[in-house]
């Protein structure tokens, strides 16, 4: 049983370390706003992971995969949301002035907005359900009891929270934030292009 948990933990940490929308959202929020705002986003992402993992654990992902129209709606909707986030970042990057021109002003988001953005960023990637469905199909057989299944669910949740907490803490360091202030418009522009790219990829790969 310990080997099962260890295997799932290793597979999930590799998946977490692969840069994607969640990583870029947390890192960009941490350097441009604050660690607190980034952590709200981390909580939102973690809740999104709980939704996808719960759906896979209950076997509901099989229903979504068989209902092609629902799968298409989820893919297109998620892609459009990521494109919208990319557009917002690109527009913000174009409006930014050089950091050397004036003292940077950090505008904090309204309470809960970063949480919602983190949640929607994670839920907008329906490929997560394929990932979690594969994990549970490969490693969680019929011989695995309910307690172990929910133990794996808790492991995935805590691992996600821990990893993105580390990411938020690192990118919120003063040195990282000073570097961001010098290159703010380029970093935001790059992040915006990535989000738009993720969104377009979701739409055309549906």
From Swiss-Prot:
Cross-referenced InterPro entries: Homoserine/Threonine_efflux, LeuE-type
Membrane topology annotation: Multi-pass membrane protein
The keyword ATP-binding belongs to this UniProt entry's keyword annotation: no
Positions on the Periplasmic side per record topology: 22-43, 88-149
GO CC terms in record: plasma membrane
Parts of the chain that traverse the membrane: 1-21, 44-64, 67-87, 150-173
Keywords of this entry: Cell inner membrane, Cell membrane, Membrane, Transmembrane, Transmembrane helix, Transport
Subcellular location: Cell inner membrane
Function: Conducts the efflux of threonine.
Protein name, as recorded: Threonine efflux protein
Annotated gene: rhtC
